[in-house]
């Protein structure tokens, strides 16, 4: 692997301003070789709360919202992208709360002869631990943004922006598209009074 503290011309990074310049080179390498480039223009997303329920998580009453982020597809109506997001926040919070967001891929099929899953840890699931801290949690389904296979690259957000055409060599791939979807979820959090959008992890 290239030395992160050595410029492409072979000179070492000696101080913070030089590191800022070297970081630009590293980001460019990742854009070109790993994740691809986000298009200069991407469509807006309009969020809709499709269901709201109250449930108890780790002994804490939580308000859970199911959301769909409708990606504007007027530029290419043959591809529809609806981003799936779940947001749960404490029902009795006195103000906006921090939120931990994760990617959720749903239950995976298990063979009939698979050993049973281990029980949750004594301190509870991650959602229960977060709820007991008085925080919220969110689960974004990344495959609702972009499928995790090559066949899906003419669909999802990549297919929508490319108007159904296959991606080019340096176009964004699924991981970069998922990050774009997470950023759109952050946009929604900024509009939800239950969420402290400056404290999302």
Annotated model-derived regions:
Residues 2-91:
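Non-catalytic accessory segments flanking enzyme active sites
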């Amino acid at each position: 692997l290239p030395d992160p503290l050595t410029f492409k011309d072979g000179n070492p990074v000696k101080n913070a301003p030089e590191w800022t310049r070297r970081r630009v080179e590293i980001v460019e390498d990742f854009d070109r070789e790993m994740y691809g480039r986000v298009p200069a223009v991407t469509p807006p997303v309009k969020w809709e709360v499709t269901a709201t329920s109250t449930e108890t998580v780790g002994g804490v009453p939580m308000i859970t919202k199911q959301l769909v982020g409708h990606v504007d597809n007027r530029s290419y109506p043959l591809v529809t992208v609806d981003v799936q997001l779940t947001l749960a926040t404490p029902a009795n919070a006195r103000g906006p709360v921090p939120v931990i967001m994760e990617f959720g891929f749903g239950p995976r099929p298990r063979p009939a002869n698979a050993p049973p899953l281990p029980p949750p840890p004594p301190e509870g699931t991650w959602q229960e631990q977060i709820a007991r801290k008085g925080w919220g949690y969110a689960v974004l389904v990344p495959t609702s943004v972009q499928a995790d296979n090559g066949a899906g690259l003419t669909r999802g957000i990549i297919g929508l922006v490319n108007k159904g055409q296959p991606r080019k060599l340096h176009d964004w791939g699924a991981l970069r598209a998922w990050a774009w979807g997470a950023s759109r979820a952050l946009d929604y959090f900024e509009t939800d009074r239950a969420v402290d959008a400056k404290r999302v992890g």
